[in-house]
């Protein structure tokens, strides 16, 4: 069933050592570098704000307050959520937009699913574009999408949630060190994967199904961002597979064949562009596996 805790003896609580922390310049630092930077926004009708999170081998983010390094003065409560400095930068762009009637576009330059519910709810933010880590050459593609020279067709490969720290995988995550390990052991840490396969969309979609079916205590308040009964719409900002385009499409499933001898499933789908802009669409097929 969903919810509950388990104690693992001889494992110490994780720390922020070995994890990334986000560091964005404050308004004071930007003013010191260029006192007129806000005024320059009035000269353009499109403001691009980049929210970045670094990535690297053997390093990641620990969601929630535990992942914030207090020595860094980051002005935030979650490394995967917005900092106060990032909010201030977005607010400055929105204010400039009011003066020149332009657009505010937020670029998500990251390798981790960040918490962007407040941006989705912000009427002053006109669009968000997930660009990942494109590198120097990849930014040519970003420019093509922003200018309309290319029509985006990508879809999220992860679930963007309201609070990452509420997921079981985040609760179990950390550089947990054994207190009774042999001193000769080179790697003295343990990652508890009590959540099994239920990470990302596998957790959110399965718990949603259990909520609908009324089983497994799925509606329990454990893991809820609101402190009330767990509700999918309160937890998920953008689901796995979400994506937009400058045009519209319809999809029709014409044929579905299951070959148990070859262990294959073949689908025939007709995709029709019903808009005025050339583009591509993604056909997504989902299967629900039994609990066996």
Name each model feature, range by range.
Residues 1-292:
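C-terminal non-catalytic regions of proteins with extracellular/luminal or membrane-system context
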């Amino acid at each position: 069933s969903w919810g509950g805790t388990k104690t693992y003896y001889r494992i110490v609580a994780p720390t922020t050592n070995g994890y990334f922390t986000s560091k964005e310049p404050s308004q004071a630092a930007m003013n010191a570098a260029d006192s007129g930077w806000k005024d320059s926004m009035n000269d353009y009708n499109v403001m691009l704000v980049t929210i970045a999170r670094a990535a690297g081998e053997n390093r990641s983010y620990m969601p929630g307050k535990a992942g914030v390094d207090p020595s860094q003065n980051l002005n935030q409560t979650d490394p995967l959520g917005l900092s106060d400095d990032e909010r201030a930068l977005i607010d400055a762009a929105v204010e400039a937009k009011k003066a020149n009637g332009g657009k505010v576009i937020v670029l998500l330059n990251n390798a981790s699913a960040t918490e962007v519910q407040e941006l989705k709810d912000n009427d002053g933010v006109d669009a968000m574009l997930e660009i990942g880590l494109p590198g120097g050459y990849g930014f040519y593609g970003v420019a093509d999408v922003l200018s309309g020279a290319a029509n985006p067709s990508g879809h999220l490969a992860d679930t963007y949630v309201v609070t990452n720290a509420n997921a079981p995988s985040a609760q179990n995550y950390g550089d947990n060190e054994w207190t009774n390990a042999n001193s000769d052991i080179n790697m003295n840490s343990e990652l508890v994967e009590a959540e099994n396969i239920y990470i990302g969309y596998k957790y959110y979609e399965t718990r949603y199904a259990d909520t609908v079916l009324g089983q497994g205590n799925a509606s329990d308040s454990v893991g809820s961002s609101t402190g009330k009964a767990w509700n999918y719409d309160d937890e998920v900002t953008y689901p796995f597979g979400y994506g937009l385009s400058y045009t519209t499409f319809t999809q029709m499933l014409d044929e579905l064949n299951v070959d148990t001898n070859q262990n294959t499933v073949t689908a025939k789908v007709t995709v029709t562009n019903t808009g005025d802009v050339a583009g591509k669409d993604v056909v997504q097929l989902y299967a629900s596996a039994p609990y066996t």
